[in-house]
Amino acid sequence: MKSLFQRRASKVRETEAMNAPVPNNQKAELLQKVVEHVDITSYDARPIIDSMRKMSFSSRDTARAADIFNMALADKGCSTWLILAGSTSAGGCMHVYRDMVKNGMIDAVVATGASIVDMDFFEALGFKHYQAAGPVDDNVLRDNYIDRIYDTYIDEEELQACDHTILEICNKLEPRGYSSREFIWEMGKWLAEGNAKKEGSLIQTAYEEGVPIFCPAFVDSSAGFGLVKHQKEKIAEKKPYLMIDAVADFRELTDVKIAAGTTGLFMVGGGVPKNFAQDTVVCAEILGVEADMHKYAIQITVADVRDGACSSSTLKEAASWGKVSTTYEQMVFAEATTVVPLIASDAYWRKAWEGREKPRWNKLFGK
């Protein structure tokens, strides 16, 4: 066993290593190891899920969540929605969500702006996310224009290029109000017209499959910088400008809920996307339309239920608000990148999605 002195000395060496000066070529060295996105079609998670079903704790919760998602896919009258918060797209799950949309496992997406713009659209432009090789002083990262998400790096200069691309798209569109869904549809169209440096992004796939993507807090992302710059420039020129209509987002997603009838939610994280999707039931009621609570719901989160926040609130709690049925619901308290690939692969290989009719909800809005 190490003495107290030895432990302190070890800690000093670790701190010195973290604060060591970084050579001028360190940025290139730091941005070497690319995050590779998991491919749910390349492995069969069914045996793992089947084994977990016989276990306890989070393993059994995960298996039950997989079962509920498969039930939703097997229910031919059910529309399944992906609710996405957090940074799992940057962490290696980006192609999971793309493949779920491509194979008709997801009919609508509600996500944070960062998931869609800073991560998915960012990579569609040919940029990458990188694995951090070891501890580096964050001030040194800042000096080298490297942004950090836990153990993942992003080139800030490339992120600013993403911001500028949003500005260019804004400047080409008619200056009026757009829901985030309509603007993201335009982003998908722009990529599909030959501008994508990486094929098969979630945005482009959703555009091609008629799957709407909603970002209720759209400007809380790289898109926000491009939109603000667009508006400032147009105001200075005394010209009309484009804006994002958040009310239209809520109205349109509620229209999808009303048209869909039975719905199932696959929730990764929580926050604004979670509450936004759940609230469509209440909004329909306020509009005088009787809408069923979301019939199937699973949520993967590490949030602590005791803080009273939306992200951590259980699905049973949502039932008290009239949002989610408690018959088929499961909370999985786990870090999402460890669980999402298992549940999604299990669903892919059980193939309950085969034969599902793709509703292409963008058609509700003339797209």
Curated annotation (Swiss-Prot):
The keyword Transferase applies. This is Deoxyhypusine synthase-like protein. InterPro entries: Deoxyhypusine_synthase, Deoxyhypusine_synthase-like, Deoxyhypusine_synthase_sf, DHS-like_NAD/FAD-binding_dom. The lineage of its organism: Bacteria, Pseudomonadati, Pseudomonadota, Alphaproteobacteria, Caulobacterales. Residues 1-23 are annotated as: Disordered. HAMAP family: DHS_like. Belongs to the deoxyhypusine synthase family. GO terms for molecular function: deoxyhypusine synthase activity.
